[in-house]
């Protein structure tokens, strides 16, 4: 097969790829210089929609409605956008070999692609129950959610199993968002996770108690402290029951699993430095190999604010790291410099009529403020994290846009404060910074 050659290649077609393409266009990339190679069949889209509006029973989001960059208020980049800019969108193409020394990528179909500068935007893949050797984990109607194909399969199952029963395995982002959207589809939901409370990597027990209570009121049955150890099926291979480690057996027409993800670094193993499961980069997302950059979920980068190296799995960082890398690529070509990446960690979620945001670092002592009663009609609450006498993190449920900006600012500025002061003042403390 003929070899294709580009000045710049982005491998991966998710959020980072789409935002990188926009920055390449802003920086004046010439027609024919840039290619995006993606194993997905569609142009880059805003992935968070898949666990939210894509699954709504009415008024569901569909492509081309949520191509990047609409998630951050930007222009919607349809396939035509890439064509107009002279960017090659090479879809349904999986790269199976990467030789960084010879600057060559090879696809599953045997096509060869040469590049001068490579941006690795491969993201993560979901951990599957079969990875842990769970019996029956390959039964039909056990779903994972990462790509649009996964969401389409789940949509079909929701139609086929109207008013059925679901078991959601996992108490993180996917577990919480999908339990909510399954209830909106009038599906009976059991949610199972091993930890003592939901979202344990971010939530404290106090925050989690609100969401668990709220979900319970919405009809989600939460089972904590155990895991799925096996599945029984109907003769047609569809899942029938979920066996739990504590001996309980749950009926299920649909199972949705969200037990974490792992970075897709396999192509580059032994060729680039890795750290904390990801590809190690500097503050410009340059890897240990010249002319090779890594962005988004796959990059382990210096988090300047906290003087440490981290890997962050979140759409906000996927967008911003992609833009930073492309700015750095053009600056280095022009003999100029750009500022180091100075990221404020940010996480958010929306489910039912809830909406929370978190900024900063969840370390140190905590203080909960506001009304965190799940039975309250006017629930609105938050939490601060204090370390060495300074605020380092802030969480807010049901905040206004101004209040959300205020908690972001307080996490960035890190003003001194006492627990008593914050308990008394609550959100008003952040609002006056």
Curated annotation (Swiss-Prot):
InterPro entries in the record: FAD-oxidoreductase/Apoptosis, FAD/NAD-bd_sf, FAD/NAD-binding_dom, FAD/NAD-linked_Rdtase_dimer_sf, MDHAR3-like_C
Binding locations of L-ascorbate: 319, 350
Annotated EC: 1.6.5.4
Catalyzed reaction equations: 2 monodehydro-L-ascorbate radical + NADH + H(+) = 2 L-ascorbate + NAD(+)
Localization per record: Cytoplasm
GO cellular component entries: cytoplasm
Protein name: Monodehydroascorbate reductase
Gene this chain is encoded by: AFRR
């Amino acid at each position: 097969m003929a070899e294709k050659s580009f000045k710049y290649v982005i491998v991966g077609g998710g959020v980072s790829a789409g935002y990188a393409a926009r920055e390449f266009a802003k920086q004046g990339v010439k027609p024919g210089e840039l290619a995006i190679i993606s194993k997905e069949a569609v142009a880059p889209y805003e992935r968070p929609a898949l666990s939210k509006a894509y699954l709504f029973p009415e008024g569901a989001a569909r492509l081309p409605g949520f191509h990047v960059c609409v998630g951050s208020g930007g222009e919607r980049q349809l396939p035509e956008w890439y064509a107009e800019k002279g960017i090659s969108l090479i879809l349904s193409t999986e790269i199976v070999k990467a030789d960084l020394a010879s600057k060559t990528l090879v696809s599953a179909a045997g096509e060869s692609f040469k590049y001068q500068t490579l941006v690795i935007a491969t993201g993560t893949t979901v951990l599957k129950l079969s990875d842990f050797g769970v019996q029956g984990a390959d039964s039909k109607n056990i779903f994972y959610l990462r790509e649009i194909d996964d969401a389409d399969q789940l949509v079909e199952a929701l139609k086929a199993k109207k008013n059925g029963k679901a078991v959601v395995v996992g108490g993180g982002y996917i577990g919480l968002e999908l339990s909510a959207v399954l209830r909106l589809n009038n599906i009976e939901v059991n949610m199972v996770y091993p930890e003592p409370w939901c979202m344990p990597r971010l939530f404290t027990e106090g925050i989690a108690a609100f969401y668990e209570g709220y979900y319970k009121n919405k009809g989600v049955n939460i089972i904590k402290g155990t895991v799925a150890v096996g599945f029984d099926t109907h003769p047609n291979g569809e899942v029938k029951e979920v066996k739990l480690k504590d001996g309980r057996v749950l009926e299920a027409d649909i199972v949705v699993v969200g037990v974490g993800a792992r970075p897709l670094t396999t192509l580059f193993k032994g060729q680039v430095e890795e750290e904390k499961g990801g590809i190690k980069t500097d503050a410009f997302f340059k890897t240990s190999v010249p002319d090779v950059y890594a962005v988004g979920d796959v990059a382990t980068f210096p988090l300047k604010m906290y003087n440490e190296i981290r890997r962050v799995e979140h759409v906000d960082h996927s967008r911003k790291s992609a833009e930073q890398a492309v700015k750095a690529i053009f600056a280095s070509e022009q003999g100029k410099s750009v500022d180091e990446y100075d990221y404020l960690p940010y996480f958010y979620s929306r489910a039912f009529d809830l909406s929370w945001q978190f900024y900063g670092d969840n370390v140190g002592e905590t203080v909960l403020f506001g009304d965190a009663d799940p039975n309250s009609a006017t629930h609105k609450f938050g939490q601060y994290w204090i370390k060495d006498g300074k605020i380092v993190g802030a969480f807010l449920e049901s905040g206004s846009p101004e209040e959300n900006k205020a908690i972001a600012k307080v996490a960035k500025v890190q003003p001194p404060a006492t627990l008593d002061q914050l308990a008394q003042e609550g959100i008003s403390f952040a609002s006056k910074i």
